[in-house]
Amino acid sequence: MFLEKLNSATSKIKLIEEKLQDINLIKNQKKYSKIIKEYTYLEKINTKKIEYEKILSQINDNKTILEKEDQQEMKELIKQELIDLDKKKEDLEHQIKILLLPQDENDSKNIIIEIRAGTGGEEAALFANNLYSMYIKYSERKKWKTEIINFNETELGGFKEIVFEIKGKDVFKKLKYESGVHRVQRIPITESNGRLQTSAATVAVLPNIEETEIDINEKDLRIDVYRSSGAGGQHVNTTDSAVRITHLPTGIVVQCQNERSQHKNKDQAMKILRARLYEFEDSKKQEQRSSNRKQQVGSGDRSERIRTYNFPQNRITDHRANITLYKLEEFMQGELDPLLDPLTIELQEQKFKSNNI
């Protein structure tokens, strides 16, 4: 099955090369760009295939030599080389399997992250702030740019909700598996008896969708303006600069009050709405795809409990891949890769099986 899919993918290269020779194709920039992207992707697979075939050939040659070799010292050298070649073969197979997975067209997109406090009152809001800080520190390590779109702060400095954007290379690809319920176990600063409390916050990672990528009918929108308010309901603006947009067909409501001008708040609210509508349509497609197999692991379902942060034990556990690390302090300082890398590999392995690769 693996080799069949590999050969099937690389066999399309010649057909695409013929398409690219069509002079009329350049006139349609959108179509041309799409074909170039597919060609680059298939070329990447083909390069790995050539490398893989070379390794297979070397393995076969070494096995043949080993059968004929009489000297024990040479036999040991050949055996060691075969071990090294087998390791390279396994690594290449894994790389090729990743490339053969159905491509997520959003992997190269920037993202909008929404963090909302869940069960746990003020402690949940403080944890939402901790998660926001964690993603900001991770973004700084990756040299990504961040911008707050909207937030609703509590009196103790927590967030009932915060929405922010991250821009950079492969942002969605790296963080798309963060969607879900994040649970925290710790003694809250608000707890005088020193009892351990469990709280939660919900994270949604949405690809940033351009205006040209989704059609939104102005007639389907109800736009309300109101005065923006700060923590505890204090008014921070004397003009009606805050904007609330309701998408009537779906009932999706977005709001923004972070900017000083109504126009900018509307632009930011529309940015969130595009991302939410895209997610709404995409989730419907996912349900259809998975209707014949109850498998939604790593799907980005925001109701799925994905991770527990246990502060007294300095422990972080990801429930989707049964990964546990005792490096919670470093993790909260933005060192996410020691968990994200093995998590991504595990979730991809699960996808290999479900896609029969």
Swiss-Prot record:
GO terms for cellular component: cytoplasm. The modification N5-methylglutamine is found at residue 234. It is found in: Cytoplasm. InterPro entries: PCRF, Pep_chain_release_fac_I, Pep_chain_release_fac_I_sf, Prokaryotic/Mito_RF, RF-1. Transmembrane segments: none annotated. Pfam families: PCRF, RF-1. Methylated by PrmC. Methylation increases the termination efficiency of RF1. Keywords: Cytoplasm, Methylation, Protein biosynthesis. Residues 283-313 are annotated as: Disordered. GO terms for molecular function: translation release factor activity, codon specific. SMART domains: PCRF. HAMAP family: Rel_fac_1. Belongs to the prokaryotic/mitochondrial release factor family. Peptide chain release factor 1 directs the termination of translation in response to the peptide chain termination codons UAG and UAA. This is Peptide chain release factor 1. It comes from Borrelia garinii subsp. bavariensis (strain ATCC BAA-2496 / DSM 23469 / PBi).
